[in-house]
């Protein structure tokens, strides 16, 4: 896996307009609706997250809910008010 990821990383680095995002999800949403409300507690679990893009540095201490706002910032798209995460970009 490491060797294959290295090859993917090298291919992305060779492109000037490509971003590589690597993460894992060990949160879960087995019960989305328990009491009629969305259960988002799983979005606070820590997960690995790496961004390979020139000029982008991530802060530490993020959570799963911060990944989508980070991707939106990279894409220069405004974060919806419903999202409670914050971008990991310093």
Where are these regions (language model features)?
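Feature captures the catalytic ectodomains and active-site-proximal regions of enzymes
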Residues: 1-90
């Amino acid at each position: 896996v490491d060797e294959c990821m290295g090859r993917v990383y090298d291919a992305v680095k060779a492109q000037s307009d490509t971003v590589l995002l690597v993460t894992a999800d060990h949160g879960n949403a087995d019960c989305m609706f328990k009491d009629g409300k969305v259960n988002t507690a799983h979005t606070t679990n820590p997960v690995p997250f790496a961004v390979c893009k020139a000029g982008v540095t991530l802060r530490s201490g993020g959570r799963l809910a911060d990944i989508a706002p980070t991707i939106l910032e990279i894409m220069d798209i405004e974060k919806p008010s419903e999202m409670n995460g914050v971008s990991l970009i310093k």
